[in-house]
Structures are given as structure tokens and as C-alpha cells.
UniProtKB/Swiss-Prot annotation:
Leader sequence segment: 1-18
EC primary class: hydrolase
Species per Swiss-Prot/TrEMBL record: Saccharomyces pastorianus (strain ATCC 76529 / Carlsberg bottom yeast no.1 / CBS 1513 / CLIB 176 / NBRC 1167 / NCYC 396 / NRRL Y-12693)
Family designation: Belongs to the glycosyl hydrolase 27 family.
PANTHER family according to UniProt: ALPHA-GALACTOSIDASE MEL1, ALPHA-GALACTOSIDASE/ALPHA-N-ACETYLGALACTOSAMINIDASE
EC number(s) on file: 3.2.1.22
Subcellular locations according to the entry: Secreted
Protein name: Alpha-galactosidase
Record's subunit section: Homotetramer.
Chief place of localization: secreted
Length: 471
């Protein structure tokens, strides 16, 4: 009954708002930015945030769209006698307003963190029961984004309505401040968040915490396969584990409210280049937030060239806002040392009539893979124009910035003469309308109504294409 109420109320609200499906007008495309947790955890400071922001700007990532700088847990030293949150003066000697001002003056947006519990996950003061005063603290300090966790929640979970009410309290408090604040739930998908998240928030985590492994199982992430409704979400979840859990959820996300598959592990740990490309591509394709988890001051050239791949980012920022669908998934006999091995095909519509597709190889050996128009346009039927048209195939990674150019940018702390896309000067939407070639990849062939798209996909890798109707 609660879920039926949510669907009914959302439909009514949508009818009133009309022009925007977002509950607060934010999140019309998935958020992009940087969060300190994956690399630095509690080792946070004013200097870290400001130096990171400067670096993101200097190497062109801000102009690619990575505009949120998000301070995660461990920033507080407690509360005053009247209950107001206090920033740790050793870590943040000039206070949070100073951080916000510096970021805003450099065209960034400032994110902070709390938990819908008595404490945060690291044991600092949480916001459960303090929603209004904490929302006012965030607003008065110029915060533009709140990541809201799920630790120490005093048992207030176990049914969708219970979790919904706990998270709605902060949603209402943020809205009451009058400041536009992007609201990012981090409740690990507990209590079917994908059903009710968009009613009160702009994004919601849908699994346990990620770690930089492509397929490796971990007992601390107990649910596997397509088990998206986990009683215990855990942490140390691999990239493929999270992706498989997300597969059925795309139908519940869209403009204003996004499934969050967790921060990006590109440049974190020891993922291969093919694994990092597949990870970034799939997060982009399912319209997950693109939040950098790496130390951008010590980024490999190859990882930088992934984060700066505008043709892939354009898939994520496509104004149609429709997450791709997994069309098929098959196990393969060539498994890795963890017993993991599978192949998948994903497809999704784009704003201008294009289609994005991915052939994903989770096996340990390079593999010939193919697809056809019936699979690509899986919801079409005989007689549909999509199935009777010829389509040009564009490789979304073929125009990737080479490692030498990337290294030069990183070493010189400047984009210089490199042709890195600038979404500040020309948005992805406008760039696509103007047919900016950097957003479409490189044409490699075409497919006819009765043809096959054939390719060889590397181990733990991806073939990632945009299809455009032939003219």
C-alpha cells in the first residue's frame, strides 16, 4: 500500500510541476564531481579540498563537468551546547564557509556529508533527530550538495515506509532552508530505495560500497548476481557485482533522480586499463553519477584519459536521461580464479534518435562478440523504422586522448593546446546539437537491417558504440 501511495502521489505531483520531473529542480542529468572517501577516507582537511579543486580545474576536468567537490565523513568535532554542528578546527581552521567561498569563486559546487543516524559511519555526530538545525547549518555554510548515509540508524529500517520517512525528514529540512541543495541518499539500496528515492531525493545508492576489483567476490558483500534487494548490502562489492544488481533498476531512474552505483574507481587500486574503461563506460551508460574517487594529484595518464573522454561523458549527460537496459547476460566457461565469467549486451536510447550499445566481456580471455538490430532495438517490432534502417557505428573510445598528451597535461598542470572538450563553454546538449565530433566518437562502419555487428572484446573489457541513422 505504501508503494502504491508513492506512485500515486508522485504522479499527482508530476502533474502539478509539469515541466520538471525533479522533486527540487536539480539533478536533470547525473551529478559529476569528486569525493574524497575512496582514497582518503578520514584523512580530510581544508587544504586537501582546495588543492584538489585547483587541480581539477587546472587539468580540465572541471570544464568537462566535474563540478561538485564533496567532503565526506570525519569533518566534524561535535556539536555546540545548543546543538549546532562544529567543524574540526584543526582540519578546517577557517571554517566551512571559507571552503565554500573558495569553491564558488572558482565555479565549483560544495558538497558535505552526514548520516540519517545517531552517528556517521566513522562515529561523528549524525543528523537523525537534528534534521532542521543541520540542514540550516549546511545552507548557511554555502553547501550545494548533501551526501546522506545510513549508519547508526537505531533500527529505523526494514520496510520501505520506515526508511522513506527517515530520509524524507532531511529532504523536507533542506527544502525549508530555501537553498537549492542536491540531495544524495547513501542508504545502500536498503528497503527498495529505487521505488521511492525520486520522490524525495536526486540520487540514491543502490548497493553496498564499491572497491577496486572487477569481479572478485567478498563475503562482506554477501548478495550476488541479480540480488538487488539485499537484507545486508555490506561493502567491498566488485564492479560487476554492483552492475548486475543495477540491471533491473534503470526503469526506476531518470531525469531528477538517479541510481547511484557508487564512486568511480578509475585510478584507484590496480584495475587494468580495459577494466577501467569498462567501469567508466557502464556507469555512464546506466546514468550513474560520475564522481571521481581517485587522488587527482597522483593520477595515471591512462586514468586521466578515461575521465576526460567526452564522447563517453556525453552518453551519461544525454538530456533524454534514460538508463540503458541489459538485453542479455550469459555465463561463459572461461572463468577467472574466483569462478567468475560472463558476457553481457546492453542498449539504450539517446535524445537525438541515436542509440548507445555495449558488448561487455566479463571473461578472462578476449572474445568475439556480435549483435544485430533486433537486439539493439529490443523493444521494437517488425515494421518499426529502426529495424529497417541502416545505422552508422561510432566507436566511443577510438578518439581517446593518448597517454603522451595526458601525461603532458598532468605534468604541466594545464590543458594547454590539447583539444579537451569544454562543457562550460558549450554544454553537452548544445555540443551534440552542433555535431561536435568529440562527442560522437569515430565512425568505424555501419550495420544494415539484416547485418551483424562483429567485434572482439578484450578480457574484462568493453566494446562501446553510438549508433546514428545513416544519411
Amino acid at each position: 500500500m505504501f508503494l502504491l501511495y508513492l506512485f500515486t502521489s508522485f504522479a499527482a505531483v508530476s502533474g502539478v510541476l509539469g515541466s520538471s520531473p525533479s522533486y527540487n529542480g536539480l539533478g536533470l542529468t547525473p551529478q559529476m564531481g569528486w569525493d574524497n572517501w575512496n582514497t582518503f577516507a578520514c584523512d580530510v582537511s581544508e587544504q586537501l579540498l582546495l588543492d584538489t579543486a585547483d587541480r581539477i580545474s587546472e587539468i580540465g576536468l572541471k570544464d568537462l563537468g566535474y563540478t561538485y567537490v564533496i567532503l565526506d565523513d570525519c569533518w566534524s568535532s561535535g556539536r555546540t551546547a545548543n546543538g549546532t554542528l562544529v567543524a574540526d578546527k584543526e582540519k578546517f581552521p577557517n571554517g566551512m564557509s571559507h571552503v565554500a567561498d573558495h569553491l564558488h569563486n572558482n565555479n565549483f559546487l560544495f558538497g558535505m556529508y552526514s548520516s540519517a543516524g545517531e552517528y556517521t559511519c566513522a562515529g561523528y555526530p549524525g543528523s537523525l533527530g537534528h534534521e532542521e538545525e543541520d540542514a540550516e547549518f549546511f545552507a548557511s555554510n554555502g553547501v550545494d550538495y548533501l551526501k546522506y548515509d545510513n549508519c547508526y540508524n537505531k533500527g529505523q529500517f526494514g520496510a520501505p515506509e520506515t526508511s522513506y520517512k527517515r530520509y524524507k525528514a532531511m529532504s523536507d529540512a533542506l527544502n525549508k532552508t530555501g537553498r537549492p541543495i542536491f540531495y544524495s541518499l547513501c542508504n545502500w539500496g536498503q528497503d527498495l530505495t529505487h521505488y521511492w528515492g525520486s520522490d524525495i531525493a536526486n540520487s540514491w545508492r543502490m548497493s553496498g560500497d564499491i572497491y577496486p576489483q572487477f569481479t572478485r567476490p567478498d563475503s562482506r558483500c554477501p548478495c550476488d548476481g541479480d540480488q538487488f534487494d539485499c537484507a545486508y548490502a555490506g561493502f567491498h562489492c566488485s564492479i560487476m557485482n554492483i552492475l548486475n544488481k543495477a540491471a533491473p533498476m534503470g526503469q526506476n531512474a531518470g531525469i531528477g533522480g538517479w541510481n547511484d552505483l557508487d564512486n568511480l574507481e578509475v585510478g584507484v587500486g590496480n584495475l587494468t586499463d580495459d577494466e577501467e574503461k569498462a567501469h567508466f563506460s557502464m556507469w555512464a551508460m546506466v546514468k550513474s553519477p560520475l564522481v571521481i574517487g581517485a587522488d587527482v594529484n597522483h593520477l595515471k595518464a591512462s586514468s586521466y584519459s578515461i575521465y576526460s573522454q567526452a564522447s563517453v561523458i556525453a552518453i551519461n549527460q544525454d538530456p533524454k536521461g534514460v538508463p540503458a537496459t541489459r538485453v542479455w547476460r550469459h555465463q561463459v566457461p572461461q572463468t577467472d580464479k574466483y569462478g567468475q565469467g560472463e558476457i553481457q549486451f546492453w542498449s539504450g536510447p539517446l535524445d537525438n534518435g541515436d542509440q548507445v550499445i555495449a558488448l561487455l566481456n566479463g571473461g578472462i580471455k578476449p572474445r568475439p562478440m556480435n549483435t544485430n538490430l533486433e537486439e539493439i532495438f529490443f523493444d521494437s517490432y517488425l515494421g518499426f523504422e529502426q529495424l529497417s534502417s541502416n545505422w552508422d557505428i561510432y566507436d566511443l573510445w577510438a578518439n581517446r586522448v593518448d597517454n603522451a598528451t595526458s601525461a603532458n597535461i598532468l605534468n604541466n598542470n594545464s590543458v594547454g593546446n590539447a583539444t579537451i572538450y569544454n562543457a562550460t563553454a558549450l554544454s553537452y546538449k548544445d555540443g551534440m546539437a552542433k555535431n561536435d565530433t568529440r562527442l560522437f566518437g569515430t565512425k568505424i562502419g555501419s550495420i544494415s537491417p539484416d547485418g551483424l555487428l562483429n567485434t572482439t572484446v578484450p578480457a574484462h573489457g568493453i566494446a562501446f558504440y553510438r549508433l546514428r541513422r545513416s544519411t
